[in-house]
Amino acid sequence: MSVVEGARVDAGAGEVPARLDGRLRLVLVVLLVAQFMLAVDFSILNVALPVIGDGLGFSLSNLQWIATSFALCAAGFTLLFGRVADLFGRRRLFLVGLAVLGLSSLVGGLATSPEMLIAARVFQGLATAAGTPARLSPLPTSFPDRPSRQKALGLIGALMSAGFTTGAILGGVLTDLLSWRWAFFINVPVALAVLFIAPTVIKESRPATRPKLDVPGATAVTLGLLALIYGLTQAGEHGWGAPSALGWLAAGVVLLIVFYAIESKSSAPLVPVSVLKKKTVAWGNIAGLVAFLTETSLVFLMTLYLQEVLDFSPLTAGLSFGVLGVGTVIGGSIAPRVIGAVGTRSTLIVGGVLQAVATLSLVALGETSASMWLLLVATFAGGVGNMLVIVGFMVTATTGLPDHEQGMATGLATMTQQIGITMGTPIMSAVAAANTDIHAGITTAVIVNTAIVVVGILTTVLFLRTKAAKDVAAAG
């Protein structure tokens, strides 16, 4: 049955969501812990960057590479590793990714030079790219019935967004109370625990027919994404008109066009063009891109507001996002029931509208702490709405595909998440920096953020329609 149009999300008529038995709950806990840990790594160092720069001797111009080196690898290599998971085993790649993440986190915490730290961040990004699609693609075999899989997708989606928010909080707490090095060290025991438990509870899975690795396509899409994301970081640092930004963005677009052309002719494409043409895949991923781009960049804007306008400490600013984290967890927890009641398309629309209204209300923030009540209420409501969209996107973009394409589909969905996280901050930073008054710049960026959410709603309303629902039903 359809998961897009107003149909209920059931495996059969009248079916209610399945209860998870003890083993499935343990599998889900392992996947959730890994998801949360990888999501935290996207933002945990943000508030600690000045302290790290002073401690290791980073120049101001090179400080951005602590975040950029991680984001480039995490987003740029995700699709490639999604297919590698199909080739060599999803559980195997999941475990390898976790091991590399734990080791690189240890190296990062022990870093004594900028080069050593950047190398650790590169391997953290690669581990994230390897671990994320490999972690999500076992869902069809671990949770073969649709209701239990939707529960898992809802919780995993919630943890992705909540982990990003928690990273901002945790980074401030660890840096303020202990040392920035603990932002790295905290990954090590978690990775070891998951590595100890995962082999006993997660089944190995790979397609029945071993697919070939599309080397030209993999090269084109990886280089294209790297160029595109690097161009966005250059735009955030130097402005949208900077030659370096325009050059890298143009190169990224050209390479992605080349990738599409390669996939159209390949006998064993990395991403079958027929899959990309499915409305559920295409527009579901567009909705996810908008959700992650806007909410994570809003955290950046509100961090800027709290520290630069209200003069809060990094610790206080980080703790202020606790209500946003609660909102995302609640939104992710109720999303499967909302989808079951009204369908994925309506859930995407309702969540988007709630997020847009909550975000737009932030234009009323003043220059005193009296505005904190508005920030807390708006970020909570926006977090709930954002998670409805994220879970709706995950269900839409990964449902109705055969098992041998699950690694690719989850790789696409994960790449969408990570590109959204990577794109958001440079875009909003460039918008905010265009105004010499920091408060006015933040207000303008909030309006732009809201407009992007509205565009996401409109694409869902206009393009994710009945035909897409039939496509999913036919494929499922």
Where do the protein language model's features map onto the residues?
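Residue-level signal for pocket-adjacent positions within structured domains
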Residues: 15, 33, 89, 134, ...
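12-transmembrane solute porter fold
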Residues: 24-40, 45-49, 60, 126, ...
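Generic structural signal for alpha-helix termini and adjacent loop/cap motifs
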Residues: 55, 142, 204, 234, ...
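Short, intrinsically disordered, low-complexity terminal/loop segments
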Residues: 3, 475-476
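Hydrophobic transmembrane-helix bundles of small-molecule transporters
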Residues: 154, 176-289, 294, 312-313, ...
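Residue-level signal for the membrane-embedded core of alpha-helical transmembrane segments
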Residues: 76, 130, 193, 223-226, ...
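Transmembrane-helix bundle of Major Facilitator Superfamily
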Residues: 2-200, 342, 348-356, 360-367, ...
